[in-house]
């Protein structure tokens, strides 16, 4: 599931954790929150790679 995630800096990892925690605080399951943030990271990385 996470094999295609790009390497993240500590700051990027921290930001991802904070976003996941925010989604969970809004009532989302942990798995769903992780899935959403992972997809967001993949999309951002793909967009940067295309430039």
Curated annotation (Swiss-Prot):
Q: Which InterPro entries match?
A: UPF0181
Which domain of life does the UniProt lineage start with?
A: Bacteria
Pfam assignment, any one: UPF0181
Homology family: Belongs to the UPF0181 family.
Q: What is this protein called?
A: UPF0181 protein VVA0806
Species of the source = Vibrio vulnificus (strain YJ016)
